[in-house]
Amino acid sequence: MNDICCIGHITLDKIVTPKQTAYMPGGTSYYFSHGISHLKDTKHYKLVTALAPTEFKAVEDIRAKGIEVKVIPSRHTVYFENIYGENQDNRTQRVLAKADPFTVEQLKDVEANIFHLGSLLSDDFSLDVVKYLSGKGTLAVDAQGYLREVRGKKVYPVDWTEKTEALKYIDILKVNEHEMEVLTGHKAVSYTHLRAHETRSKLV
């Protein structure tokens, strides 16, 4: 059994700046796996991802670093377009393609002590997937994807519609200050505020 399993889409990112346009792989699961690859022991880690065959080179690069990868076929790869102005803090983001969401059936043969869900968009992981994985091990979730919804090609900030129920099954929740404010409705937030949502989260 693996100690840690990260589940999430590897993306194709189009980065547009006033000086150049570049294409590169990305996504929480991609960078998480590259971070793990710098540790001495990678044999107890596994990545589960879903992407189209056109982006399989990103998987090959990760495997070349000694990481075990399970690829779930998808009709498309998540394709982000990030446009930056002269001020790099100003970014316009669009989603030009979405991958298929993960399902319980696809994850039945995946075993680990800790699962980390690298969500990128609000429909990557259903509540059923969250419930299922919470019964198999410690569940950690990156909240950012649940707070982003795609309409057309534009990305809109949204609240996590099923957060009250989902947070009951999550042991570790990764959020930044803005995400915590969206989840709790408080600018000056604390662990106590999140507990008000009846979570089982031990770490935030």
Task: Say what each PLM segment does.
Residues 8, 49-51, 143:
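Short beta-strand/turn micro-motifs composed of small residues
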Residues 12-23, 38-123, 128-138:
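Conserved N-terminal subdomain of the carbohydrate kinase-like
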Residues 8-13, 199:
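Short polar catalytic/cofactor-binding loops
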Residues 22-35:
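Short catalytic helix/loop segments, enriched in acidic residues and glycine
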Residues 118-190:
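Conserved beta-alpha-beta core of the PfkB/ribokinase-like small-molecule kinase fold
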Residues 192-199:
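Conserved small/polar residues in nucleotide/adenosyl-binding loops
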